[in-house]
Amino acid sequence: MKAVIFAYHDMGCQGVQAVLDAGYEIAAIFTHADNPAENTFFGSVSRLAAGLGIPVYAPDNVNHPIWVDRIAELAPDIIFSFYYRNLLSEEILHLAPAGAFNLHGSLLPAYRGRAPLNWVLVNGESETGVTLHRMVKRADAGEIVASQRVAIAQDDVALTLHHKLCQAARQLLNSILPTMKCGNIPSVPQRESDATYYGRRRPEDGLIDWHKPVSTVHNLVRAVAAPWPGAFSYNGSQKFTIWSSRICPDAQGALPGSVISVSPLRVACADGALEIITGQAGDGITVQGSQLAQTLGLVAGACLNRPPATSGKRRIRVLILGVNGFIGNHLTERLLDEENYEVYGMDIGSNAISRFLLHPRFHFVEGDISIHSEWIEYHVKKCDVVLPLVAIATPIEYTRNPLRVFELDFEENLRIIRYCVKYRKRVVFPSTSEVYGMCTDASFDEDKSNLIVGPVNKPRWIYSVSKQLLDRVIWAYGEKEGLRFTLFRPFNWMGPRLDSLNAARIGSSRAITQLILNLVEGTPIKLIDGGQQKRCFTDIRDGIEALFRIIVNEGDRCDGKIINIGNPDNEASIQELATLLLDSFDKHPLRCHFPPFAGFQVVESRSYYGKGYQDVAHRKPSIDNARRCLDWEPSIAMRDTVEETLDFFLRSVDIAERAS
């Protein structure tokens, strides 16, 4: 059987050797060039392949059509991926008749995603493992072929667990590969309800929070111990790294982060003390704890983890226009969670952002973007990243007020885009899933799908074409004027503070809010055209995390990109959404305060929205760009989102007033 292998790291070397030992013919190996900035403590797949006389390649983009064609010419019977760091396109996955199989470093469906080795230690797990599974479009979601459990000892650190996993992987592959070679490939579906997903870990994630329980801090030390970057803290402006530690139950009443003793070196946490066994000051050498205390000049009672001294690097200033809106207020919360962001915002109200008004890094002005142009231009010039989030984005308004939609959504936003061009500022612009219109593709691709709208006499398309035209103008400014931009397209984001029940009362709200209002007031749930239209509903937390990563823009990977942000797995019809919502409503502890359910009522779209409306049968995103550019995968189930959204709205109702 002929195999093509994608491999990297020690696991890649183990996988290649196991495939050879099982008698497969390896036509080619694809790997990565080592990153000079990374500590390459692990084995080299390229050197192994070269020594074995096997062709080896390290393309920047293995999914490019040129490489897809070259792999097709190799005519593989089977494809293996052993710790290859990039997702493989569906075109590649479909090249092998026997299928494509990936080795993942956890017991799937738990710990899908990146860095499972480190995450299981961070979370204090007592068991992990390795899993061989079929590869599908979605990362780590295919059927399981085989798995092997690995116990995590209390003294395991990242490197010792890494060695255990490599050994388990070799045993697993030695056991299953001969069977697969004979064409017998048993597999069982993963249980989606048990799936968990974790993203990439960064060196800065090793910062210790001494207010956490001592076990949490100790587990962080274990999870990122050498050769990983390490858990670290500060003594004033001096950074130090902790390489090994142990838990001491008694903090002697000391405040978290304070030094209890220097020999041994012990630091108070929330519920105990951490004894630092070995550590390193700055870029120095590794020493035992008491010597580290001496090097840092620590004394009992000293307080660690103070902010580093001013380094001259100012915070990133983010301008959010429409900051009080659904996306704006949630994004503000995410940005303020990070110390290096400062948020400037404008909106016509502040009810959703009242919790931030006293925050020292949040600066708000109440105003209208169509009036306060001087303030906006000044702050575009002042800030680093601009997000013009102001738009009319409810379907009934497209037919009620098409000219107002055009004036606000296109004309006012175009002026802001031109300020960004003038002052050479990066813009992160909210396009919309509506731009795809009546596209017939099974899933909508940012770079390939056609944007199809209806006739001119259907004003519901005014929003879609206003956004599409701005997309094209922004793209042209990028090509001709060097504007730095990213366009993101949200697909039906839902969550708390989506809009308001008052907006639903006048028909100017999102679908789920209207449905909740019907339940609250005991009126029939109206299913427009039977509610058969399908959408992919996305939790606001998933959406905001993706948007935050666009703002971070690691390696400038988002520049000039269009990125869908949605959850393809949460596809449901409006009728299914209503049924799920009703089920959650009936189970809610406040259910007894509201009227009986009044049933469903089928309504024609023309009578509800007016003659200028057209609907769309389905709207499902491809999220390959988000996976590639953001290392992002949505993880929150639709039921969780519905329950949380419902809970927010029900608790916003004045129960006492209703009772009276």
From Swiss-Prot:
The record marks D140 as: Raises pKa of active site His. It catalyses: UDP-alpha-D-glucuronate + NAD(+) = UDP-beta-L-threo-pentopyranos-4-ulose + CO2 + NADH; UDP-4-amino-4-deoxy-beta-L-arabinose + (6R)-10-formyltetrahydrofolate = UDP-4-deoxy-4-formamido-beta-L-arabinose + (6S)-5,6,7,8-tetrahydrofolate + H(+). The active site is at H104, E434, R619. GO terms for biological process: lipid A biosynthetic process; lipopolysaccharide biosynthetic process; response to antibiotic. NAD(+) binds at D347, D368, I369. UDP-alpha-D-glucuronate binds at residues 393, 398, 432-433, 460, 492, 526-535, 613. The keyword NAD applies. SUPFAM superfamilies: FMT C-terminal domain-like, Formyltransferase, NAD(P)-binding Rossmann-fold domains. Residues 1-304 are annotated as: Formyltransferase ArnAFT. Gene3D superfamilies: 3.40.50.12230, NAD(P)-binding Rossmann-like Domain. GO terms for cellular component: membrane. The record marks N102 as: Transition state stabilizer. Its EC number is 2.1.2.13, 1.1.1.305. The keyword Membrane does not apply. Homohexamer, formed by a dimer of trimers. PANTHER family: BIFUNCTIONAL POLYMYXIN RESISTANCE PROTEIN ARNA, UDP-D-APIOSE_UDP-D-XYLOSE SYNTHASE 2. Bifunctional enzyme that catalyzes the oxidative decarboxylation of UDP-glucuronic acid (UDP-GlcUA) to UDP-4-keto-arabinose (UDP-Ara4O) and the addition of a formyl group to UDP-4-amino-4-deoxy-L-arabinose (UDP-L-Ara4N) to form UDP-L-4-formamido-arabinose (UDP-L-Ara4FN). The modified arabinose is attached to lipid A and is required for resistance to polymyxin and cationic antimicrobial peptides. In the N-terminal section; belongs to the Fmt family. UDP-L-Ara4N formyltransferase subfamily. In the C-terminal section; belongs to the NAD(P)-dependent epimerase/dehydratase family. UDP-glucuronic acid decarboxylase subfamily. This is Bifunctional polymyxin resistance protein ArnA. It comes from Salmonella paratyphi A (strain AKU_12601).
